[in-house]
Amino acid sequence: RALIINSRDGMDEASIYSQTDVLEIKNNSIDSYSINPKDFGIRGNSIEEIKTNSERSSLDIIYTVINNIDSDARKISLLNAALLVMLFKEISLRDALSECNDALENYLVRDKFNQYIDFTNQVSKDVK
């Protein structure tokens, strides 16, 4: 099973600013559909909010998302993560959005990210 995604605003991921066209490959067939973020109550403010030009600003965006701060970065991350959950769990996008939203609201994403940081720091120490 796979998704090929192209947002109408030119991003190579699902967008919160415009519709996203999807080709879903499943069981030797291809379904074509569009996702309108407004249908799921998702509205972006400005694409400029998610643009980044440095490692520091990228990290700031990551921390905004994992700390569950309402932002365009959180919304677009939620939508794209939900598409993956939908794909692998074979559930509806609405249900996947709910699962991903719960993970953000309960800080499970932040906790997992911090575990990853701890792990990589330990590996780095072990290698030295």
Residue ranges and their predicted role:
Residues R1-K128:
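Glycine-rich anion-binding loops and their surrounding alpha/beta cores
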